[in-house]
Regions:
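Catalytic cores of alpha/beta
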Residues: 76-86, 119-127, 164-179
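Histidine/lysine/aspartate-rich catalytic loop segments that bind and position anionic ligands
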Residues: 94-139
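Glycine-rich beta-to-alpha transition loops that act as phosphate-gripper elements at the mouths
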Residues: 21-24, 71-77, 93-96, 113-118, ...
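Short, charged, surface-exposed secondary-structure boundary motifs
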Residues: 100-104, 122-127, 142-147, 167-169, ...
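Glycine-rich phosphate-binding active-site loops on the catalytic face of alpha/beta enzymes
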Residues: 94-100, 134-142, 176-195
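A charged, well-structured terminal subsegment
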Residues: 148-151, 200
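Conserved N-terminal beta1-alpha1 strand-loop-helix module at the mouth
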Residues: 1-86, 106, 166, 193-215
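Structural preference for beta-strand elements that scaffold enzyme active sites
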Residues: 15-17, 42-44, 66-70, 89-90, ...
Length: 218
């Protein structure tokens, strides 16, 4: 297990989790320098990505101290063991699995379980979630985040799914503590064509928009 520790301070500098799914280690090698340079501090590699263990290990070797590096799509204990063996500093799940959550809490590994209804969200939080992942976020939009925060103002929410430059601040203003962004950030066409200049512009536009908002509300 990796000894590097997840940094909440680093996450809060730019509370966006970039979600990488299905990329090769070569693509990750090309993308991460641009991602870090834009100011992002947290990255998630989903476990259904081929050779994800090597990707996580490479990222830790190259970006330890610069990035929070986590594993996503962790659904059961076997997935958790795989993620922790690779060195994941935090865990993201699409569901609430009590065994996974209790083990993460026992090991002081931040866990972001997926939930949707008020009951699921409260259960996830009560089991020790770092934040509760709201997925799919676009189905009910920012208004749903605001509605959930009304009775549960103490619960930190991280919407995931369909978040892009046009709506990211709407979710933040509704009360989100963080955002999870995948394909809207890691444009597949740009990556396949190795259009690093355009991808850099996209990274910087997203990062700067969220940073500016945080400065305004600080």
């Amino acid at each position: 297990m990796n000894t590097a520790i997840y940094s909440r301070e680093k996450f809060n500098q730019l509370p966006v989790v970039g979600i990488i799914r299905g990329m090769s280690i070569e693509e990750v090698m090309d993308i991460l320098p641009l991602y870090v340079h834009a100011g992002f501090t947290t990255i998630e590699f989903t476990l259904n990505t081929p050779d994800v263990e090597s990707i996580i290990k490479y990222s830790l070797e190259q970006y330890k101290g610069k990035l929070n590096i986590g594993a996503g799509t962790v659904c059961d204990r076997n997935d958790l063991d795989k993620a922790l063996k690779a060195g994941a500093q935090f865990i993201v799940a699409p569901i609430v699995n009590e065994e996974v959550m209790k083990e993460c809490v026992a090991l002081s590994i931040p866990v972001f379980p997926g939930a949707y209804t008020a009951t699921e969200i409260y259960k996830a939080w009560s089991l020790g979630a770092e934040m509760v992942k709201i997925f799919p976020a676009t189905s009910l939009g920012p208004a749903y985040i605001k509605d959930i925060k009304a009775p549960f103002n103490q619960i930190k929410l991280m919407p995931v799914g369909g978040i892009d430059l046009t709506n990211c601040l709407d979710f933040m203003k509704a009360g989100s503590s963080g955002l999870g962004v995948g394909s809207q950030l890691f444009n597949k066409k740009m990556i396949q064509e190795k259009n690093w200049e355009q991808l850099t512009e996209q990274f910087e536009a997203f990062a700067n928009k969220v940073k500016k908002y945080l400065q305004e509300v600080d």
